[in-house]
């Protein structure tokens, strides 16, 4: 969608997800394999470190190179794992792993939101969904439940 000559951020919601971080790893791998760079925006330093470890170790037969935004290899690393959002190095794919909408999401070409089966997570996701929709963003929904497969 275009607005005044600018492309609006493409927003994708993946819902009914059993394991949010495993799905985030899979989506990061998929984007990286397509030559896209991913900015994983985590809740805090601990969550950021945990997700980074998962990227290095999962899936079992491969890994997804990642680093922090201040790493000397950040400019050439496919996935940046961050929790501050103060030093954005690219504008391709933003993977939101927080419960609130990222204030800088609109500078990215694509935003990915992952919604688990947890009721609190679903409530917070509904708030984000409404926020984006009320601002005119088109949202693509992806049902990852077993019944949808």
Segments from the language model and where they lie:
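Helix-rich interaction surfaces within compact, conserved domain-sized segments
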Residues: 103, 121-129
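Positively charged, polar, low-complexity stretches
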Residues: 2, 6, 10-106, 117, ...
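Trafficking entry modules
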Residues: 110, 114-121
